[in-house]
C-alpha cells in the first residue's frame, strides 16, 4: 500500500497533480508464474470527476544466471467509473531485464494507450505506444538508497510524437515502511502530447507500507 503526492507513469500525471492512494497485491511461485492486481485513484482528464484505475497482470519470471533476471508481464488497465466509458481502458505488454536486482532495463508496448487529441476528435483516443526505460535503485548507506531513471516513449496516431522523461530521488527503509522523495521531469515534447499532465520539474513524496 502506498500514499503518494502524485501518480506518475512515464512522466505523466494520472491524478492531475493530486495525491494518490494505491494498493498492490502480487503472487509468485517457484516455477516463475507471476500474477497480481493494482488499484489507485486517478484523474486523467481535469474536466472529469476523480476515478479509479484498476489493473490486473499475468506474467513469467526467470533467471539467466545468478546476476541477471528477466520478467514479462501482460497487463489490463480499466477505469470503470469514468464518463468516457471504455475509452480509457488499455492493455500493455512489458519486458524487464534486471542486474542483481538494482539495475533494470525495460521495454513496453500498448496497442491502444489513451491520449487526448484536441482536433479533430477533442476526446481521448487509443493509440499505439512504444517505450523503453533504464532505472536503478542502489543502497548507498545503511537503509538509504538512491534512485534514478530515464526513459523514452513514442505515441502514434494524429499528431504523433515522442518524448523523454527522467527522475531521481532517494528512499529510506524503516522495516515494513519505506519513505521516498523524488524529482520527475519530461522533455518539452511531452506537453504537446499530454498538456498539463506532463511533469515539469515536480517533486513527489511517497510512503510505502508492505504487509
Q: Each PLM stretch: what is its role?
A:
Residues 17-21, 50-54, 68, 87-93, ...:
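Residues that define the transmembrane beta-barrel architecture of outer-membrane proteins
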Residues 3-9, 29, 39-43, 62, ...:
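Transmembrane beta-strands of outer-membrane beta-barrel pores
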Residues 84-155, 183:
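Detector for outer-membrane/organellar transmembrane beta-barrel domains
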Residues 138, 168-177, 183, 197-211:
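Outer-membrane beta-barrel "beta-signal"
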Residues 31-37, 66-72, 101-107, 138, ...:
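Repeated loop/turn-to-beta-strand initiation elements of outer-membrane beta-barrel proteins
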Residues 16-69, 209-211:
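Glycine- and aromatic-enriched membrane insertion/assembly motifs of diderm outer-membrane
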Residues 9-16, 46-52, 82-89, 115-123, ...:
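Outer-membrane beta-barrel translocator domains and adjoining extracellular loop/strand segments
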Residues 24-26, 57-59, 73, 94-96, ...:
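Outer-membrane beta-barrel architecture
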